[in-house]
A protein has these predicted regions:
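Short, acidic, Ser/Thr-enriched surface-loop or helix-capping motifs
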Residues: 87, 93-94, 116, 121, ...
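Residue-level recognition of beta-strand microenvironments
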Residues: 52-55, 95, 102, 127-129, ...
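Glycine-biased strand-turn-strand hairpin within the trypsin-fold
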Residues: 23-40, 44-99, 107-109, 120, ...
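Short glycine/Trp-rich loop-beta-loop segment that forms part of the substrate-binding cleft
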Residues: 98, 120, 153-174, 254
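C-terminal recognition in membrane/secretory proteostasis and scaffolding
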Residues: 2-5, 21-29, 36-40, 89-91, ...
């Protein structure tokens, strides 16, 4: 029992060092400091943390009705529908009623509601979705007041061991506060977004916490709680949050009226440094981002970056792997330049890279209709911007599938987001108009050549 009490007291002093912790990280100097409470912080923060409820119409699953031939033969239009509901959390980031949450909380929603800490509810519209970061921004409808917001902390200033509070709506029970510490920084192997650079915390995070706030001891937002590692479905002390510096970029795009996030584009393909590569380069440790190739007429090319260069730092921040570089590069504001340190031939060079967006030549996105296997797929031309978004080579031939509608013919035959269609029935597909035209033709068989994960696949489907 003594040990339990001691551990509890230890956590109290670690977690309640209040404002001074963010500044000098000192230990408590008196018993009075040990009796401090989180309540003042929570009272400031809670009004800006909201509950998010999303609803969408889905089809009841029946394996017999999955077969289009079965449906056509018996004259069945489709599977019966029902309303599916999900819940999560969000953070108010602008007094006008802008709320940041996770894309996976509101994905596919036909209706979104936001419940405030004072129990008032508002209909909300989705103003921006950024699947690459799993962040979305909502706007409260029919609201004419100023709402409480959270200030952003600089997540780069976080340290392992810093005290944090997680606030959200776990399991839909209502707003809940848990405490813990920053367990790790720059987690890059979580595998849930394009930008792998998460804050890890042992503050209890459960289903329903997604989109909620992770705050420091000054009540500032340091992250958006997004995922957990769990074998049971509940908290096991390993939670992940998107750093506030990434959240700030997405929120700023929404505040400026953008429908998509505009980010700097390097125009180079990077790869991780393996122990073998490190040994061949004479490195003590396998760290950095190795340049595999550089696209012509890109910011990387203009800066003088070359294949086989090893990026070791950006603006003074060390780079351990390509994920770290991607995160640090894209959280820079557009305009101006960024200084990159590279190793080339045993020497360190400093290169100045312009912070520009990828050129977005006419992507001409089309949602394919008709009775072909492509029905329900949205396809786009492969511009540099599309290639950057979907991790493709910009010089790849074909058109890429950017979305696959649930229950569509394209989904039923197994097409996936990111598939590149290069030929159909021996006709080369160079742009979306080519595929749109071919997909409207009648055919008994569809012979399709596509790229998936860098591998060419030839398939034949019935008409």
């Amino acid at each position: 029992m003594t040990l339990i009490r001691f551990v509890a007291a230890l956590f109290v002093f670690l977690l309640v060092a209040a404002p001074s912790l963010a500044q000098d990280r000192r230990v408590p100097s008196s018993a009075a400091e040990l009796r401090l409470s989180y309540a003042p912080i929570v009272q400031r923060v809670q009004p800006a943390v909201v509950n998010v409820y999303a609803a969408k119409v889905v089809q009841n699953h029946n394996p017999f009705l999955d077969d289009p031939l079965f449906r056509r033969f018996f004259g069945i239009p489709g599977q019966p529908e029902q309303m599916q509901r999900s819940l999560g959390s969000g953070v108010m980031v602008d007094p006008s009623g802008l709320v940041v949450t996770n894309v996976h909380v509101i994905e596919g929603a036909d209706q979104v509601k936001v419940s405030l800490s004072d129990k008032r509810e508002f209909e909300a519209e989705i103003v921006l979705k950024d699947p690459r970061s799993d962040l979305a921004v909502l706007r409260l409808k029919d609201s004419h007041e100023k709402f409480p917001t959270l200030d952003f902390a600089n997540s780069d200033e976080l340290m392992v061991g810093d005290v944090v509070l997680a606030i959200g709506n776990p399991f839909g029970v209502g707003q809940t506060v848990t405490h813990g510490i920053v367990s790790a920084l720059a987690r890059t192997q979580v595998g849930i977004t394009d930008y792998q650079f998460f804050i890890q915390t042992d503050a209890a995070i459960n289903p329903g916490n997604s989109g909620g706030a992770l705050v420091d001891m000054t009540g500032r937002l340091v992250g958006i709680n997004t995922a957990i590692f769990s074998r049971s479905g509940g908290s096991q002390g390993i939670g992940f949050a998107i750093p506030s510096n990434m959240v700030r970029v997405v929120a700023a795009s929404a505040k400026s009226g953008g429908k998509a996030v505009r980010r700097p584009w390097l125009g180079a393909h990077l790869q991780a440094v393996t122990p073998d590569i490190a040994d061949s380069l004479g490195l003590k440790t396998p760290s950095g981002a190795l340049v595999a190739s550089v696209l012509p007429d890109s910011p990387a090319a203009h800066a003088g970056l070359k294949a086989s260069d090893l990026i070791v730092a950006i603006d003074g921040q060390p780079i351990d792997d390509p994920n770290a570089f991607d995160y640090r590069f894209v959280t820079h504001p557009l305009g101006g330049t960024s200084e990159i340190d590279v190793l080339r031939g045993g020497k360190t060079l400093k290169l100045s890279v312009a912070l520009e967006t990828a050129p977005d030549t006419n992507r001409n996105e089309i949602k394919l209709e008709g009775r072909s296997p492509f029905q329900g797929a949205t396809v786009a031309n492969i511009s540099p911007a599309v290639a950057d978004e979907m991790h493709l080579d910009a010089d790849t031939d074909g058109v890429v599938m950017t979305e696959i509608a649930d229950g569509s013919a394209a989904a039923n035959v197994g097409f996936q987001k990111g598939d590149i269609i290069q030929a159909v029935n021996n006709k080369r597909i160079g742009k979306t108009g080519d595929l749109d035209k071919v997909s409207r033709e009648q055919a008994r068989l569809w012979r399709i050549t596509l790229l998936r994960g860098g591998q060419q696949i030839n398939v034949t489907l019935g008409g």
